[in-house]
């Protein structure tokens, strides 16, 4: 039988191993652990090169969100869905599409089960942020079980947004969504739904955020609120080789076009054709 956990801010998991150890300490069963591990493997592929606006690896944010939900709720599909909560909006699927397409939903379902997939879809569909969070708060008493679960995932996401002063390290914290009014709604929503541990973590995260001052040398400006991708050096080198090859091909095409034009002109005027490339590889008239 899984147990709930008291989760200090400094013990929120940031890696898969830390998350697994947390779940083992909470006595999660093997089936539940396997479901979470399957979700992590898919998340690792979808977010391998994505970073947060503050340059925190996105996979660490997903793990932290899952860690918070696991401390509050012992349902494996909720923790698995927390690992994949941004899959349909920010995951790198490589299909050129957007949102929860049937093909993407099928992949998530195969990796983490239908209950997990439904939660990820519901998370994606729930309006959240400036104004919307207050709207959820006004109808908190009328939320059904699934909506309450998705709100828990949203609140866990908020914990990691604010934890470690994360919003101080980029200009994402300047958005209205992270203003005092919305922060108050988030805190009150956690309390009204009885998510005591999440409410405590939010309180601590807000306090740390308020007390932290970050120098300009560590602050990332002009970022997309969803973060971005960082290509590995090996990929950049391969791209450089390909670009150079394409440039060489372009030069060859232009040389060929000039020779053809010269030959056509020579036929018309009776002059000899234009310059040719020698058999030694030297270029003339380029």
Show which residues each predicted segment covers:
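Active-site helical microenvironments for divalent-metal-assisted chemistry
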Residues: 2-276
């Amino acid at each position: 039988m899984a147990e709930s956990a008291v989760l200090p801010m400094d013990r929120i998991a940031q890696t898969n191993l830390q998350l697994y150890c947390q779940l083992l300490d909470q006595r999660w069963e093997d089936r539940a652990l396997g479901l979470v591990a399957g979700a992590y493997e898919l998340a690792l592929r979808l977010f391998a090169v994505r970073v947060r606006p503050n340059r925190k690896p996105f996979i660490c944010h997903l793990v932290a969100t899952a860690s918070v939900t696991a401390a509050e709720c012992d349902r494996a599909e909720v923790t698995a869905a927390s690992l994949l909560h941004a899959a349909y909006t920010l995951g790198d699927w490589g299909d050129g599409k957007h949102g929860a397409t049937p093909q993407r939903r099928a992949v998530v379902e195969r990796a983490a089960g239908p209950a997990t997939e439904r939660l990820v879809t519901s998370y994606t569909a729930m309006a959240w942020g400036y104004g919307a969070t207050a709207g959820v708060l006004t109808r908190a008493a009328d939320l059904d079980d699934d909506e309450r679960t998705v709100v828990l995932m949203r609140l866990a996401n908020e914990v990691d947004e604010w934890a470690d002063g994360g919003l101080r390290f980029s200009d994402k914290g300047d958005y209205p969504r992270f203003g005092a009014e919305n922060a108050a709604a988030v805190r009150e929503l956690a309390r009204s739904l009885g998510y005591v541990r999440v409410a405590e973590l939010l309180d601590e995260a807000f306090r740390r955020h308020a007390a932290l001052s970050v120098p300009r040398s560590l602050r990332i400006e002009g970022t997309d609120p969803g973060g971005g991708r960082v290509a590995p050096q090996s990929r950049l080198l391969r791209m450089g080789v390909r670009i150079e090859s394409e440039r060489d091909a372009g030069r060859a095409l232009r040389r060929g076009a000039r020779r053809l034009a010269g030959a056509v002109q020579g036929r018309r005027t009776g002059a000899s054709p234009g310059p040719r490339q020698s058999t030694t590889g030297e270029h003339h008239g380029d």
